[in-house]
Amino acid sequence: MNFVDVEPTLENYWRAIILFGRNTASYKFALAKSLIDVSLDSKSDLITLDDLALPYAMHLCEHLKHSPKQSTSNNSKFIQACIDFNQGAITETQLIDTTTKEGFKYVLDAFHVVNTKAVQERFYDVIDEEFFIDERKFNKGIRLTDNLFKLFYVFDHSAENLNQETESRWNLVEKAWELNLNKNLVAVEFDQHTKQLFSHDSRHRRVGITSSRGALNG
């Protein structure tokens, strides 16, 4: 079954963003996980960039510890700030300041953009509202919509399941970058003895990708 034939539910709309959005950097994944965090914890639908900055940056900081390549660009002030924070070179306050200034420049505009036109039309014809509204110009933040709260606060287990799927997709993109492969060309194999998923790098060496299992299901 083609993905566009799947029922256009909020869960599948989220999956479309995670699966088919652009992956020139991992900011989309960090933002997605941050949105899950704030939708569960916030008492207001208005989230300032200052409040969103720390959970957003910390997700990226955590991934940088095991996957240094988080962007196809080599000159990101935001990523450098996360690296500096991990190394103890800057404070949490400095990390938040840099994240607020540099970390949201493109990701908020790009988050809901799905590159596959058929998927985009399939969901936008049925789901009449995105997961957040950009209010940086007037309120220095974003406003969470009912769709986000329905998805992660009302529906049972959605936060847990989609959080893991987002994490797994992030791991898979990292692995593709590590192998210097297009993320759609990662050949997945299964070792019957160890019960682990693996692929091969450009030198035909085995590389484990079991951490990406959630993104490969289905």
Where are these predicted regions, by residue range?
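Mixed-charge, low-complexity interaction segments
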Residues: 1-217
